[in-house]
A protein has these predicted regions:
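Amphipathic alpha-helical interaction surfaces in cytosolic regulatory modules
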Residues: 22-101
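Short acidic-hydrophobic, aromatic-tinged amphipathic segments that line or gate anion-handling sites
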Residues: 102-106, 110
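Residues that form or immediately flank small-molecule/cofactor binding pockets and catalytic motifs
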Residues: 12, 86, 108
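Short secondary-structure transition/capping segments
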Residues: 93-94, 112-116
Length: 123
């Protein structure tokens, strides 16, 4: 299966649910890069990549994620990861990606991490 991308929002955080694989040979990394580039160009500054259903990523896919992380950081934004697992997690660990890109196992905690410190939700 190639890469499928679903986009949803939670407050001011844009969440990309990735399913399948992100590799150079199938053009999936280019698809991911184009999607992220368009979101950033349209003003998105808080991105959460849900990797729970991403089964494979190669160095091209990792390069896309790192490039967009840097692009967002330089614009005052943030890119974070949700639920990297299996082979994807192994690749991220080997490349030490998780040392500078925040990663979460729980979506609620990931979303809360985008809020300013001391933020209290008003009911």
């Amino acid at each position: 299966m190639g890469l499928q991308i679903s986009i949803r929002e939670s407050g001011d955080v844009t969440i990309l649910d990735l399913r399948g694989k992100s590799t150079i040979d199938g053009g999936e990394s280019e698809l991911l890069g184009g999607c992220l580039k368009e979101l950033i160009a349209n003003g998105v500054r808080k991105l959460l990549l849900n990797l729970a259903d991403l089964t494979q990523v190669d160095t091209t896919g990792v390069g896309v994620i790192i490039g967009k992380y840097i692009s967002l950081r330089d614009r005052g934004g943030e890119l974070k990861l949700l639920c990297p697992c299996g082979r994807v997690l192994e690749v991220f660990r080997v490349l030490r990606l998780l040392q500078f890109i925040s990663s979460f196992e729980d979506e609620t905690q990931a979303l809360a991490s985008f809020r300013p410190k001391g933020y209290v939700a008003r009911l």
